[in-house]
Amino acid sequence: MKRFLTSLVALAVTATAASVVHAADKLTLQLQWVTQAQFAGYYVALDKGYYKEEGLDVTIKPGGPDIAPPQVLAGGGADLMLNWMPSALAARERGVPLVNIAQPFKSSGLQLTCRKETGITKPEDFRGKTIGVWFYGNEYPFLSWMSQLGIPTDGGSDGVTILKQGFNVDPILQKQADCISTMTYNEYWQVIDAGISPDDLVVFKYQDQGVATLEDGIYVLENRLKDAAFQDQMVRFCLLYTSDAADDSLGV
């Protein structure tokens, strides 16, 4: 009987150890913005079980206009995050040791979308206008652009008035702003869907203006990369975006 109990305990210990070895590694991903097509690949990977196949148990946290991903990461609310490089660099300057471990987006989709009736035909026409701009680090490309143009950003007839833009396109629909920030794959089409014709809009792509920056990089805290187990988790997570998993999101 004693031998049986000893064997049973040994078996239980072995089973427990095996379950620990094969338990999925929990990861929390903080998105840059609210749930939208921009992040389709991450949701497709979750829905189709690609993370699970890599031994990862991933939780995706949506962002928003009042959520700063670097703060979430620094506070331990996420293991990795999506962020634009200007925001990440600004956070690093403030003491948050962010490191870019992958760059899924290779070009910028950021643009300013303006009502044609405002008379804006070129960037120099922004003077005296109200511009909707996203904050929490996303404002830096715009501020850099205005600096290059020599246009003040503190209002007045010779400068631009900055409107802190939320997650919708209401400022241009309600004529609270002459231009708003949009992404080529999202907010621009929200404006169109709201009934404004493309012929009634003027669009300025940051890429065309030479002021674009890298967007949607995957960032982690530098000190966590000292952990070999965490490194392995990040490799498994990021490799999904060089595989067929990334292609599946194209049909979404």
Describe each model-derived feature in a short phrase.
Residues 250-252:
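N-terminal low-complexity segments that are often proline-rich with Ser/Thr-Pro
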Residues 13-17:
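Hydrophobic core
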Residues 19-23:
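Sec/Tat signal peptide C-region and signal peptidase I cleavage site
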Residues 25-174, 178-185, 204-206, 212:
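Short, glycine-/small- and polar/acidic-enriched structural segments
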Residues 1-8:
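Bacterial N-terminal signal peptides that target proteins for export
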Residues 104-114, 198-227, 234-238:
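Periplasmic-binding protein-like
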